[in-house]
Amino acid sequence: MNLIAAAIAIGLSALGAGIGNGLIVSRTVEGVARQPEARGQLMGIMFIGVGLVEALPIIGVVIAFMTFAG
């Protein structure tokens, strides 16, 4: 049962991160298409957002390992 819980935790966190990253990058591309001069500022904000979104799957993997090991 712990193995199933760990797999679900990893899968859902990866799914959420994929959707979140897709939304962040698509909105950044739209912003650059509308205002090309703001490209540098938008890219910096995008990388911060992607980094924050990617932190969640890492936390999910850690929790899954703790669940599986415990």
Curated annotation (Swiss-Prot):
Keyword Membrane: yes
Keywords per UniProt: ATP synthesis, Cell membrane, CF(0), Hydrogen ion transport, Ion transport, Lipid-binding, Membrane, Transmembrane, Transmembrane helix, Transport
Signal peptide: none
Superkingdom of the organism of origin: Bacteria
GO cellular component entries: plasma membrane; proton-transporting ATP synthase complex; proton-transporting two-sector ATPase complex, proton-transporting domain
InterPro entries: ATP_synth_csu_bac/chlpt, ATP_synth_F0_csu, ATP_synth_F0_csu_DDCD_BS, ATP_synth_F0_csu_sf, ATPase_proteolipid_c-like_dom, F/V-ATP_Csub_sf
SUPFAM superfamilies given in the database record: F1F0 ATP synthase subunit C
Keyword field contains Oxidoreductase: no
A Pfam family matched in the record: ATP-synt_C
Gene Ontology biological process terms from the UniProt entry: proton motive force-driven ATP synthesis
Parts of the chain that traverse the membrane: 4-24, 45-65
Site feature Reversibly protonated during proton transport, where: 54
One MF term in the entry's GO annotations: proton-transporting ATP synthase activity, rotational mechanism
Membrane topology according to the record: Multi-pass membrane protein
Cellular localisation: Cell membrane
Subunit structure: F-type ATPases have 2 components, F(1) - the catalytic core - and F(0) - the membrane proton channel. F(1) has five subunits: alpha(3), beta(3), gamma(1), delta(1), epsilon(1). F(0) has three main subunits: a(1), b(2) and c(10-14). The alpha and beta chains form an alternating ring which encloses part of the gamma chain. F(1) is attached to F(0) by a central stalk formed by the gamma and epsilon chains, while a peripheral stalk is formed by the delta and b chains.
HAMAP family, sorted: ATP_synth_c_bact
Reported function: F(1)F(0) ATP synthase produces ATP from ADP in the presence of a proton or sodium gradient. F-type ATPases consist of two structural domains, F(1) containing the extramembraneous catalytic core and F(0) containing the membrane proton channel, linked together by a central stalk and a peripheral stalk. During catalysis, ATP synthesis in the catalytic domain of F(1) is coupled via a rotary mechanism of the central stalk subunits to proton translocation. Key component of the F(0) channel; it plays a direct role in translocation across the membrane. A homomeric c-ring of between 10-14 subunits forms the central stalk rotor element with the F(1) delta and epsilon subunits.
Family recorded in the similarity comment: Belongs to the ATPase C chain family.
Protein name: ATP synthase subunit c
Protein source organism: Staphylococcus aureus (strain NCTC 8325 / PS 47)
